[in-house]
Amino acid sequence: MSQWFELQQLDSKFLEQVHQLYDDSFPMEIRQYLAQWLEKQDWEHAAYDVSFATIRFHDLLSQLDDQYSRFSLENNFLLQHNIRKSKRNLQDNFQEDPVQMSMIIYNCLKEERKILENAQRFNQAQEGNIQNTVMLDKQKELDSKVRNVKDQVMCIEQEIKTLEELQDEYDFKCKTSQNREGEANGVAKSDQKQEQLLLHKMFLMLDNKRKEIIHKIRELLNSIELTQNTLINDELVEWKRRQQSACIGGPPNACLDQLQTWFTIVAETLQQIRQQLKKLEELEQKFTYEPDPITKNKQVLSDRTFLLFQQLIQSSFVVERQPCMPTHPQRPLVLKTGVQFTVKSRLLVKLQESNLLTKVKCHFDKDVNEKNTVKGFRKFNILGTHTKVMNMEESTNGSLAAELRHLQLKEQKNAGNRTNEGPLIVTEELHSLSFETQLCQPGLVIDLETTSLPVVVISNVSQLPSGWASILWYNMLVTEPRNLSFFLNPPCAWWSQLSEVLSWQFSSVTKRGLNADQLSMLGEKLLGPNAGPDGLIPWTRFCKENINDKNFSFWPWIDTILELIKNDLLCLWNDGCIMGFISKERERALLKDQQPGTFLLRFSESSREGAITFTWVERSQNGGEPDFHAVEPYTKKELSAVTFPDIIRNYKVMAAENIPENPLKYLYPNIDKDHAFGKYYSRPKEAPEPMELDDPKRTGYIKTELISVSEVHPSRLQTTDNLLPMSPEEFDEMSRIVGPEFDSMMSTV
């Protein structure tokens, strides 16, 4: 999609900014007619190079002639007239000063890009604001419902007190009336009738109050059920999905504190209802009648309250931090036998009456059917302390939690050797950790159980990349915690899903994810030239099948590049110096129109162990197609000896009998090499220790420096005019410095 086309899709306020860029000196109609051609030219170079600007000026006139011819074929007289007029204006204004025209076009294109970037930021901010507003409104609505539930139960509490007072008064008046009837003098029949009418009226009030309270409790339980369903089926499910994404590098998981507040309020409300029902039962025992609404409804309401409370408590027991080895904090859910790992469970309800001696017990593969149904499925024992008392010290907010910090896995060895006949390889075999505890309260015991996300168990650290690939694939596609047979028939992933997860792998360990161009190249690697968001990638294509004609698959290649970035290229990647994922064809298209010495950095597509290279462009002396030179890729072995910025600073090419020259001048598109990498160059070291302490003229060893030198035949360098000839003595000395391999290389030229 051309830049000009993107601009035309913007809102009117941004289009107005585009209108202000163009006037009669360079009319917008030329920008419209020659949009793609204009965007492909290097106007920045032409803006300071008269010769290059002159060529581009005449090229532009030729393009207008071609456009005029197309309009002639269409018999479009008006557009023909406009083209001729525009061409004359350009000739009048810039024939003698083509650099000025190049400067105008360069600035216009540059300002267009700024407008696009501003529009994109504006749209993202708008989308973010909308999403945040929707989320905030949703939270406010739920918070209001939870608070309303709390208010309702307080109102019922007051109603029960009123009922108790009314019942006490009724009981007192009944007894008083009975005592008076039993006295010797008795009471007048008229007074007795009046008292009975009053007592009957009080009874009706008492009966109505009981019915009213029962009705309000029933309605409150209806509200609680709806609110609780939202908490359990929406909010908690969303949190668990966010946790899955966070485990595989996605945005950090949201805090559980808000959920805990809601869960706790609802739980306290249900506990209060249980107490209120007990109070109603006490009032019933003191005074009952037919039909008593308390007698009729108490068991149903009590059972319903208990079921809601049980459901809430059982759902509130979660794995707050998934199993993870401290040695690999950014790759949870992959566990190595014999290596300690940690896991943390938490109860999202703060109940003061809870038994603080509640123990959590951890099990491995409890009730896992695959142990019996999948051939070759491995079995493991948990070593270390796998039980712990839940306490509030494990959490800063007073919630009950238990973190098991010193767990290890050991494989159960069966008699004989393990066969490899099973359908799953080790890193596709999924296991799970489950946690059990009990909530004990007077007259109430609730069994709680929760399960971790599936884990992969490896026995060698070399299996970690493959195990992590399984974790990525599962958590990208599945929300079920116990689908341990997933890899018996793994589903395909949409490219739109996988591309996001791939970008997370970089953004989670660096400050920069993958941009659209980098993802486009990776998409083509997996899906071919017609890669799109709806493209389907099989599991085998992702990490089992060799890519193209290479002897390695896609994921191991990505993983080794990630390691290379983390260990040797982190600052350069964070600064955006590394283009990284770009095909050779795209690389040449970008460099073709750049000034000589322009280079870019990309990752090697042919190195399984992860490597980076640079390619630079040279102008051909005969005016033909430019020449491109790519250096042999650098792996972690070379980068452990010399940093990549120092390699770029000191890199030399050498042709026979010429002084070596550094061909790298500008980081694409036009950033001075020293400006881009200067802050990462190694600083001069202090003078080393003297060779001979008794000789004051000796200041120390002669310092050496490792540099990268490429020896090439003079015919491969198109800029040999810039290389100064060396004398035989100079050439011999340089050969000695470079190394003994130089003579053997020269003898083959």
UniProtKB/Swiss-Prot annotation:
PTM description: Phosphorylated on tyrosine and serine residues in response to a variety of cytokines/growth hormones including IFN-alpha, IFN-gamma, PDGF and EGF. Activated KIT promotes phosphorylation on tyrosine residues and subsequent translocation to the nucleus. Upon EGF stimulation, phosphorylation on Tyr-701 (lacking in beta form) by JAK1, JAK2 or TYK2 promotes dimerization and subsequent translocation to the nucleus. Growth hormone (GH) activates STAT1 signaling only via JAK2. Tyrosine phosphorylated in response to constitutively activated FGFR1, FGFR2, FGFR3 and FGFR4.
Phenotype of the disrupted gene, per the record: Resistance to bacterial lipopolysaccharide (LPS)-induced lethality.
Record-level GO BP terms: blood circulation; cell population proliferation; cell surface receptor signaling pathway via JAK-STAT; cellular response to cytokine stimulus; cellular response to lipopolysaccharide; cytokine-mediated signaling pathway; defense response to virus; DNA-templated transcription
Sequence position, cross-link Glycyl lysine isopeptide (Lys-Gly) (interchain with G-Cter in SUMO1): 703
Modified residues (Phosphothreonine): 748
Keywords annotated in UniProt: Acetylation, Activator, ADP-ribosylation, Coiled coil, Cytoplasm, DNA-binding, Isopeptide bond, Methylation, Nucleus, Phosphoprotein, SH2 domain, Transcription, Transcription regulation, Ubl conjugation
Sites bearing N6-methyllysine, chain numbering: 114, 175, 296, 366, 525, 637, 665
Modification sites for Phosphotyrosine: 701
Pfam family, one: SH2
SMART domains (UniProt xref): STAT_int
Record annotation: effect of changing residue 748 to A: Abolishes IKKB-mediated phosphorylation at this position. Confers resistance to bacterial lipopolysaccharide (LPS)-induced lethality without affecting Stat1 protein expression or interferon signaling
GO MF term set: DNA-binding transcription factor activity; DNA-binding transcription factor activity, RNA polymerase II-specific; protein homodimerization activity; RNA polymerase II core promoter sequence-specific DNA binding
Cross-link (Glycyl lysine isopeptide (Lys-Gly) (interchain with G-Cter in SUMO2)): 703
Stretches assigned to coiled coil: 136-317
Domain SH2, chain residue ranges per copy: 573-670
Entry-linked InterPro entries: p53-like_TF_DNA-bd_sf, SH2, SH2_dom_sf, STAT, STAT1_C_sf, STAT1_SH2, STAT1_TAZ2-bd_C, STAT_linker
A GO CC term assigned to this protein in UniProt: cytoplasm
Sites annotated Required for recruitment of EP300/p300: 724
Residue numbers bearing the Phosphoserine modification: 708, 727, 744
Record localization: Cytoplasm; Nucleus
Sites bearing N-acetylserine, chain numbering: 2
Family label: Belongs to the transcription factor STAT family.
Its biological purpose: Signal transducer and transcription activator that mediates cellular responses to interferons (IFNs), cytokine KITLG/SCF and other cytokines and other growth factors. Following type I IFN (IFN-alpha and IFN-beta) binding to cell surface receptors, signaling via protein kinases leads to activation of Jak kinases (TYK2 and JAK1) and to tyrosine phosphorylation of STAT1 and STAT2. The phosphorylated STATs dimerize and associate with ISGF3G/IRF-9 to form a complex termed ISGF3 transcription factor, that enters the nucleus.
UniProt protein name: Signal transducer and activator of transcription 1
